[in-house]
């Protein structure tokens, strides 16, 4: 059994689409970044890569690589899942939290979880998404940025339980 954590933060800017968990959200600003800047998916990728001892998102999908310019972060997550499977790991569960002052995300959390589960080929019940504000404090609270953090539990494929939960 292995556990990894992930964290990401991106600045909010005008003129960009806001994407969280692969869901395009109506909002006056979007996250600035090389890919679609989906902080939620980036944090999940980092948690999974860390749990597997495979470094971090920047090692595999650097912002200096033109192949990843504007790409959907769900594609990065799919590739992360492939790397884990190749190393013999099975995703048991993911728990992630988005930190954002606005917009309200409650109505979108299930779709975000479903998108990430689909990208990884796991049951949506194995992915949990939460959202919170920072009560007006820091860059997130001032509406200048959004952040996300995640924890992931993985096991070696041989240890996979008979219920068939997780990846694979």
From Swiss-Prot:
Q: Its annotated pathway?
A: Isoprenoid biosynthesis; isopentenyl diphosphate biosynthesis via DXP pathway; isopentenyl diphosphate from 1-deoxy-D-xylulose 5-phosphate: step 4/6
GO terms in the biological process aspect are:
isopentenyl diphosphate biosynthetic process, methylerythritol 4-phosphate pathway; terpenoid biosynthetic process
**What are this entry's molecular-function GO terms?**
2-C-methyl-D-erythritol 2,4-cyclodiphosphate synthase activity; metal ion binding
Q: What is its EC number?
A: 4.6.1.12
Protein origin, superkingdom = Bacteria
* Residues that, per the record, bind 4-CDP-2-C-methyl-D-erythritol 2-phosphate: 8-10, 34-35, 56-58, 61-65, 132-135, 142
The cross-references to SUPFAM superfamilies, in alphabetical order and at most eight, read: IpsF-like
| Key word Ribosomal protein present | no
Q: Which UniProt keywords apply?
A: Isoprene biosynthesis, Lyase, Metal-binding
User: What broad class of enzyme is this?
Assistant: lyase
Known catalytic reactions: 4-CDP-2-C-methyl-D-erythritol 2-phosphate = 2-C-methyl-D-erythritol 2,4-cyclic diphosphate + CMP
The prosthetic group or cofactor this protein requires is:
a divalent metal cation
InterPro entries for this protein? MECDP_synthase, MECDP_synthase_CS, MECDP_synthase_sf
Q: Could you tell me which NCBIfam families the record lists for this protein?
A: ispF (TIGR00151)
| Matching PANTHER family | 2-C-METHYL-D-ERYTHRITOL 2,4-CYCLODIPHOSPHATE SYNTHASE, CHLOROPLASTIC
On assembly, the entry states:
Homotrimer.
- What protein family is recorded? Belongs to the IspF family.
Question: How is this protein named in the record?
Answer: 2-C-methyl-D-erythritol 2,4-cyclodiphosphate synthase
Give the species this sequence originates from.
Desulfosudis oleivorans (strain DSM 6200 / JCM 39069 / Hxd3)
């Amino acid at each position: 059994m292995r556990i990894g954590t992930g964290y990401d933060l991106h600045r909010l800017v005008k003129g960009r689409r806001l994407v969280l968990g692969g869901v395009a959200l109506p909002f006056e600003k979007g996250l600035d970044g090389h890919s679609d800047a989906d902080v939620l998916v980036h944090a999940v990728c980092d948690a999974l890569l860390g749990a597997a001892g495979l470094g971090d998102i920047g090692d595999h999908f650097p912002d200096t690589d033109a192949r990843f310019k504007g790409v959907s972060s769900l594609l990065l997550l799919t590739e992360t899942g492939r790397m884990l499977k190749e190393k013999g790991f099975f995703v048991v569960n993911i728990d992630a939290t988005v930190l954002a002052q606005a917009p309200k995300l409650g109505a979108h959390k299930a779709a975000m979880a479903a998108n990430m589960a689909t990208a990884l080929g796991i049951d949506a019940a194995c992915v949990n998404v939460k959202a919170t504000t920072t009560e007006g404090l820091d860059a997130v609270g001032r509406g200048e940025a959004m952040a996300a953090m995640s924890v992931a539990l993985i096991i070696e494929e041989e240890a996979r339980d008979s219920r068939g939960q997780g990846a694979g």
